[in-house]
């Protein structure tokens, strides 16, 4: 991994498809809350290479719009969509979560994983307000981010930032709930568990055994900071 390369980009170069803090366990829990069907119109914000969007379309036959700011990730996403034969159901475009290119009341469900944590306080509010704007009345927001369960986590936060080489801004579990409720969301349901994104067991659970990538992952494991071993939870 280069000095300035963000951790999840490094993992993507090694072939990792699930770039989420709580891995497939957290994503599956979110999807269970979504009540997806073939009639659902879904938006995935920060879709990356569209692993989740593709699985949703394959499983439920729903239509999915994906947005991401990274043109390289979107290039991979388009290739993955084409390979899966889902060009009619899954579409992607470059866009900013704080200024979504969709009309009001467009979507039944929004899924957003591992992005709000990357934003500062004001940007979080702007993004969440945009989600509320483009959701239909009664729509659902499914979000998967990093949270803390203890009040004082300054040292662990510094270690986490160093580990993934990004200035992340996770919140306490209670503060995440307060943030969503203050922006107009109701019936906020929370779940949290261990952060598995950059652990070898988590990678194996998410992706299976990787063959040629295994040695690279073992070398990366040695570089981890203590933040990962402290079980920083996901929201």
What are these model-derived regions, one by one?
Residues 20-38:
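Conserved alpha-helix/loop element of class I SAM-dependent methyltransferases that forms part
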Residues 43, 49-99:
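Class I SAM-dependent methyltransferase SAM/SAH-binding core
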Residues 98-110:
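A short acidic, Gly/Pro-enriched loop at the edge of an enzyme's catalytic core
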Residues 109-123:
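A short SAM/SAH-binding and catalytic strip from SAM-dependent methyltransferases
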Residues 125-140:
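A short glycine-rich, Lys/Arg-flanked "PGG" loop and its adjoining helix->strand segment in the class I
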Residues 168-183:
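Short alpha-helix
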Residues 191-235:
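C-terminal helical/coil "lid" or tail adjacent to the Rossmann-like core of SAM-dependent
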């Amino acid at each position: 991994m280069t000095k300035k390369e963000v951790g999840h980009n490094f993992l993507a170069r090694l072939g990792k498809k699930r770039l989420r803090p709580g891995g497939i366990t957290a994503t599956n829990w979110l999807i269970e809350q979504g009540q997806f069907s073939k009639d659902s119109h879904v938006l995935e914000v920060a879709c990356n290479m569209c692993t989740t969007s593709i699985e949703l379309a394959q499983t439920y036959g729903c239509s999915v719009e994906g947005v991401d700011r990274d043109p390289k990730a979107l290039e991979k996403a388009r290739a993955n969509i084409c390979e899966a034969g889902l060009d009619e159901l899954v579409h992607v475009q470059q866009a900013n979560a704080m200024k979504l290119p969709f009309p009001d009341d467009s979507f039944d469900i929004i899924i957003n994983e591992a992005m709000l944590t990357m934003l500062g306080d004001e940007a979080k509010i702007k993004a969440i307000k945009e989600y509320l704007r483009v959701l239909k009345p009664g729509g659902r927001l499914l979000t998967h981010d990093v949270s803390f369960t203890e009040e004082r986590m300054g040292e662990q936060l510094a270690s986490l930032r160093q580990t993934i080489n990004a200035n992340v801004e996770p919140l306490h579990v209670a503060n995440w709930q307060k943030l969503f409720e203050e922006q107009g969301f109701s019936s906020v349901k929370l779940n949290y568990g261990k952060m598995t994104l950059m652990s070898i067991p988590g990678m194996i659970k998410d992706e299976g055994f990787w063959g040629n990538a295994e040695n690279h992952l073992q070398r990366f494991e040695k570089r981890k900071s203590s933040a990962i071993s402290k079980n920083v939870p996901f929201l």
